[in-house]
From Swiss-Prot:
It is a multi-pass membrane protein. It is an enzyme of class 2 (transferase). Keywords: Cell inner membrane, Cell membrane, Cobalamin biosynthesis, Magnesium, Membrane, Transferase, Transmembrane, Transmembrane helix. Joins adenosylcobinamide-GDP and alpha-ribazole to generate adenosylcobalamin (Ado-cobalamin). Also synthesizes adenosylcobalamin 5'-phosphate from adenosylcobinamide-GDP and alpha-ribazole 5'-phosphate. One of its GO terms (biological process) is cobalamin biosynthetic process. GO terms for cellular component: plasma membrane. This is Adenosylcobinamide-GDP ribazoletransferase. It comes from Vibrio cholerae serotype O1 (strain ATCC 39315 / El Tor Inaba N16961). The keyword Kinase does not apply. It catalyses: alpha-ribazole + adenosylcob(III)inamide-GDP = adenosylcob(III)alamin + GMP + H(+); alpha-ribazole 5'-phosphate + adenosylcob(III)inamide-GDP = adenosylcob(III)alamin 5'-phosphate + GMP + H(+). Belongs to the CobS family. Pathway: Cofactor biosynthesis; adenosylcobalamin biosynthesis; adenosylcobalamin from cob(II)yrinate a,c-diamide: step 7/7. Its cofactor is Mg(2+). The chain crosses the membrane at residues 9-29, 41-61, 64-84, 114-134, 141-161, 196-216, 235-255. The gene is cobS.
Length: 261
């Protein structure tokens, strides 16, 4: 049992090292197989990041206004992840916006330079998050909001690996170890982690959020297959960012119509 728990802890720390800038022991064992299995903890890494952001936001509100506290927490989030998912969103936007064929889109996505489409997507998403979070802060505590959004969005993004073709042909791609299909156990861990953050909310909200997550996943997956033939690591980052925005929108819709969440 101790060996099993140690192995799972090592997988979690591997996920932390891949999906964030949080330091982990340099002696952590690594292999492509372990990295693929670590995908099951993508949502748990989100929960950790959300908890850190929630704590810092709570402390910041003791010194600054809500708007400044939200801004500082967003900056912290970017530092914690190295803008990992935002980078994926920008690359995908450039590729899909600038390419006429799937091959050309994938080629553009490999270019590290950011273009007009990527810049526009980043501005809109970051501005959208700021506006939504400041609106939500006037209506409810942001602590459970950070936890839910950071966890569920990553669970949905990682679940795409389960049954979506991987289309990058770059052997050195940073997401290559995650390209294998997730096992049933991996999906179960992702789902249970996300569900844990939903239990704070009402059953009505939980039902809507689960339905919205499944619908978003299906629509985004089909769109990726049509436009690219499958997914790349950049697409997972884009999925996380868009799903996070969707979560904030649904929360705000519930609260503004005075429906209990």
């Amino acid at each position: 049992m101790a060996a099993i728990l140690r192995y799972q802890l090592e997988l979690f720390l591997l996920a932390v090292s891949f999906f964030s800038r949080i330091p982990v022991p340099v002696s952590l064992p690594y292999s492509s197989e372990r990295m693929n299995q670590a995908g099951r903890y993508f949502a748990l890494v989100g929960l950790l990041l959300g908890a850190i952001c929630a704590l810092v936001y709570s402390l910041a509100t003791q010194l600054f206004s809500t708007n400044i506290s939200v801004f500082l927490t967003m900056v912290l989030s970017l530092l914690l992840t190295g803008a990992f998912h935002e980078d994926g969103l920008a690359d995908m936007a450039d590729g899909v916006g600038g390419g006429m064929t799937a091959e050309r889109r994938l080629e553009i996505m490999k270019d590290s330079r950011i273009g007009t489409y990527g810049s526009s997507a980043l501005i809109m998403v970051l501005l959208g998050k700021y506006l939504l979070l400041t609106e939500l802060a006037d209506l409810t505590s942001l602590v459970p909001v950070w936890l839910l959004a950071y966890t569920l969005s990553r669970a949905v993004a990682a679940s795409l690996i389960r049954n979506t073709p991987y289309v990058s042909d770059t052997d050195s791609s940073k997401s290559k170890p995650l390209a294998q299909q997730l096992s049933g156990t991996d999906v179960a861990v992702l789902s249970l982690t996300a569900l844990a953050t939903l239990l704070y909310f009402s059953w009505q909200f939980i039902g809507v959020m689960i339905a919205a997550s499944l619908i978003f996943r299906q629509i985004f997956r089909q769109w990726l297959i049509r436009r690219l033939g499958g997914f790349t690591g950049d697409c997972l980052g884009a999925a996380q960012q868009l799903m996070e925005i969707l979560i904030y929108l649904i929360l705000l819709a519930f609260l503004q119509h005075e429906v209990m969440i």
